[in-house]
């Protein structure tokens, strides 16, 4: 009975947030104000919504005093909250980072980290994403893997938490600040994933974390609140002049984060933000607060389509890739914004990039990407940065005609290249390409060179591949190749993608001739 009422209340709450009107609120608020005051300490905001529709029609149905009283609503929501925490807390773990000294030994050597009595100095939270021992957390909590050991505490109620040494890092992604670790544990309970695209401000969420408590007592702590805001930006460092592929260090600096008033302490990075259906809709992160946001606000990485794609790659030990368009963009003028115009103003189109191939021009205003509205340049780079490399994107463009007439709106399609993402140590990715004769090849747009805009004026970026790295003293090194070189041809075959380059060189034995964009030709000897 209580469970059904809880579901009824939850459905009502969600409908009310999307369908309520000012007139209904005004009409009913006065009549229920005394009840709201009495219960607000238990369920702030929630009971108001229940009582607001107390006896009012909702989508053809009614919820009146005979069906759910105020006290029953409180008990139903309390039961729902307790049940949600009980179902999801078993999927939340603690992660300890133990520093090594100069000799490579752990500094905290007085107590064995595998002992239940060991409590680490540095800790974070993680979420189980596979019963075979895969744990998701934030990339930034790992620090320097060569300087630290890692241990994971898993809740084993009614016993104290079991502790496991991390076997390896499956893969990490600095762009989305996600990482997946592997521990030697089985029969874990994966966290169900929800859909953050369904979130609205005011929805109820529960934050699960407290790694110190998990490690000490085997217990997860819970706090609750509402979704305070959506698409918030993490503070960013100063942008390089001209923007470019390295303008933002993280996708979340462009406006993706969920903001909640649920209390998040330091150490809760990598914890779960769940809805009342027991689904994770965000991965909590303290990074935004550390970079200068208000302490009272909590932030979480949304569980959206990009999150799911990245998670699938990380679980498989792969680094995900992300799209690159090839424009420098800025905001519209203040006059345009005051007139209600929105979009990203294209300042420059880099030759040989997807933007040039699609037909974009300087002065164009991009207003949508794949039907998602674009309000400014951050919005443009956010939507492009969510896409995988080689994805086709639909761009809605506003173009000013030569003669001062009404701007023309039309659609373009671009096939994205690959953007540069901060390089990571080889041990942080299990499935990484094996260098060919010491040569690691990438998309020409994914090298991270600071002067890509200048190089695009003299190098055909759409008709070459780039040299990401060269192993010292390898055949490629001895031939004179270095990181940042661009390769046009393998023998007499043109190459424009790393996969094509690999197919061509793998089919050849003995010396292989490469033509470079700087008009050099080198010969790579067999190993």
Question: PLM features: what roles do these ranges have?
Answer:
Residues 43-57:
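Bacterial N-terminal signal peptides
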Residues 55-66:
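Signal peptide processing junction and immediate N-terminal pro/mature segment
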Residues 433-462, 467-475:
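Extracytoplasmic/periplasm-facing segments of secreted or lipoprotein envelope proteins
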Residues 513-516:
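Short, exposed beta-strand-loop hairpins at the edges of beta-sheets
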């Amino acid at each position: 009975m209580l469970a059904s009422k809880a579901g009824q209340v939850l459905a009502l709450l969600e409908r009310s947030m999307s369908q309520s009107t000012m007139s209904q609120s005004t009409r009913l608020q006065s009549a229920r104000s005394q009840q709201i005051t009495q219960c607000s300490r238990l369920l702030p905001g929630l009971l108001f919504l229940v009582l607001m529709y107390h006896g009012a029609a909702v989508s053809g149905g009614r919820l009146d005093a005979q069906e759910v009283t105020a006290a029953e609503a409180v008990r139903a929501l309390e039961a729902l909250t307790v049940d949600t925490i009980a179902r999801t807390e078993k999927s939340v773990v603690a992660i300890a980072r133990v520093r090594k000294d100069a000799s490579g030994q752990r500094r905290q050597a007085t107590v064995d980290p595998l002992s239940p009595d060991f409590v680490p100095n540095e800790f974070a939270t993680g979420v189980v994403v596979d019963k075979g021992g895969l744990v998701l957390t934030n990339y930034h909590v790992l620090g320097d893997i060569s300087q630290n050991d890692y241990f994971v505490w898993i809740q084993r109620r009614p016993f104290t938490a079991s502790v496991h040494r991390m076997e390896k890092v499956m893969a990490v992604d600095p762009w989305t600040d996600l990482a997946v670790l592997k521990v030697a544990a089985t029969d874990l309970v994966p966290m169900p994933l929800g859909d953050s695209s369904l979130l609205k401000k005011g929805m109820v969420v529960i934050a699960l974390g407290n790694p110190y408590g998990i490690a000490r007592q085997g217990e997860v702590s819970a706090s609750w609140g509402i979704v305070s805001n959506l698409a918030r930006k993490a503070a960013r460092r100063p942008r390089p002049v001209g923007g470019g592929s390295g303008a933002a260090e993280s996708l979340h600096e462009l406006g993706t984060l969920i903001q909640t008033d649920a209390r998040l302490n330091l150490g809760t990075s990598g914890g779960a933000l769940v809805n009342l259906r027991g689904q994770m809709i965000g991965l909590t992160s303290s990074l935004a607060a550390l970079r200068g946001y208000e302490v009272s606000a909590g932030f979480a990485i949304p569980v959206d389509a990009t999150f799911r794609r990245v998670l699938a790659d990380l679980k498989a030990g792969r680094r995900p890739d992300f799209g690159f368009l090839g424009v420098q963009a800025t905001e519209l003028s203040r006059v345009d914004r005051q007139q209600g115009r929105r979009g990203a103003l294209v300042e420059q189109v880099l030759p040989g990039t997807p933007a040039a191939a699609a037909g974009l021009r300087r002065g164009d205003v991009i207003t949508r990407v794949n039907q998602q509205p674009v309000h400014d340049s951050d919005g443009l780079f956010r939507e492009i940065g969510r896409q995988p490399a080689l994805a086709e994107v639909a761009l809605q463009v506003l173009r000013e005609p030569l003669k001062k007439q009404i701007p023309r709106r039309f659609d373009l399609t671009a096939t994205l290249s690959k953007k540069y993402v901060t390089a990571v140590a080889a041990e942080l990715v299990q499935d990484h390409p094996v260098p060919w004769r010491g040569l690691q090849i990438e998309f020409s747009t994914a090298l991270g060179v600071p002067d890509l805009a200048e190089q695009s004026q003299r190098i055909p970026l759409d008709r070459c591949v780039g040299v990401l790295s060269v192993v010292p003293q390898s055949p490629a090194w001895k031939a004179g190749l270095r990181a940042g070189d661009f390769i046009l041809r393998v023998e007499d075959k043109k190459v424009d993608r790393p996969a094509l380059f690999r197919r061509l060189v793998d089919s050849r034995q003995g010396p292989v001739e490469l033509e470079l964009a700087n008009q050099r030709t080198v010969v790579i000897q067999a190993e």
